[in-house]
UniProtKB/Swiss-Prot annotation:
The keyword Cytoplasm applies. This is 3-deoxy-manno-octulosonate cytidylyltransferase. Pathway: Nucleotide-sugar biosynthesis; CMP-3-deoxy-D-manno-octulosonate biosynthesis; CMP-3-deoxy-D-manno-octulosonate from 3-deoxy-D-manno-octulosonate and CTP: step 1/1; Bacterial outer membrane biogenesis; lipopolysaccharide biosynthesis. Belongs to the KdsB family. InterPro entries: Cytidylyl_trans (IPR003329), KdsB (IPR004528), Nucleotide-diphossugar_trans (IPR029044). The keyword Repressor does not apply. GO terms for cellular component: cytosol.
Length: 248
């Protein structure tokens, strides 16, 4: 099947300045992500960045770059600029791979593209089971609940669904009902164009989760359980050291 991967790579980062270019065993992190995306079988892989140093690193690795503005408020807004600059048709399948996921399996990049292509929906994403209470109650682990057809009902930083009877007795054992959302999305290009015309929603501001804008406006997001669990993403210096050890 035909799809395009876009990797937003914003240079500024509060916790890890210059994050796309941090060295992981001899390569900039963004190059590791680029290589994983290429392995997915995508027709094109484009790195969207606002910084010349990132562009140079990607081009040195033979990658394609689209320079974007620095003032985007979200990764989806950056994607929309790339969609317009590249002139993608509305039915083009776009997969958004985060630029700080050097251990993302190529298989799940393709999985989200295939899931979207098989459905009449504008957006698709993935999740993985949560097995430990610490993760279920961690606000940095976004949870998702779905309907019977696999469409998202809600995303939250809270522990959803709340297991009333189980948690009344103990919050140390969580059962098998929790799913952690992965930050990988598939879209049709036309859906991205529509998304950026919508005003941010109140729920989006409360939870700080941009995908809630989609549900607020009555659109569907398909969610599937990922075929493989991705490795550690890089948000902090501690994450970086962990990834360096795992990729050694």
């Amino acid at each position: 099947m035909s799809f395009v991967v876009i990797i937003p790579a914003r240079f500024a980062s509060t916790r890890l300045p210059g994050k796309p270019l941090v060295d992981i065993n001899g390569k900039p992190m963004i190059v590791h992500v680029l290589e994983r995306a290429r392995e997915s079988g995508a027709d094109r892989v484009i790195v969207a960045t606002d910084h010349e140093d990132v562009a140079r690193a990607v081009e040195a690795a033979g990658g394609e770059v689209c320079m974007t503005r620095a003032d985007h408020q979200s990764g989806t807004e950056r994607l929309a600029e790339v969609v317009e600059k590249c002139g993608f048709s509305d039915d083009t399948v776009i997969v958004n791979v985060q630029g700080d996921e050097p251990m993302i399996p190529a298989a799940i990049i393709r999985q989200v593209a295939e899931n979207l292509a098989q459905r009449q929906v504008g957006m698709a994403t993935l999740a993985v089971p949560i097995h430990h209470a610490e993760e279920a109650f961690n606000p940095n682990a976004v949870k998702v609940v779905m309907d019977a057809e696999g469409y998202a009902l809600y995303f939250s930083r809270a522990a959803i669904p709340w297991d009333r009877d189980r948690f009344a007795a103990s919050q140390e054992v969580i059962g098998d009902t929790f799913l952690r959302h992965l930050g990988i999305y598939g879209y049709r290009a036309g859906f991205i164009r529509r998304y950026v015309t919508w005003a941010p929603s109140p729920l989006e501001h409360i939870e700080m989760l941009e995908q809630l804008r989609v549900l607020w406006y009555g659109e569907k997001i398909h969610v599937a359980v990922a075929q493989e669990v991705p490795g550690t993403g890089v948000d902090t210096p501690e994450d970086l050291e962990r990834v360096r050890a795992e990729l050694h």
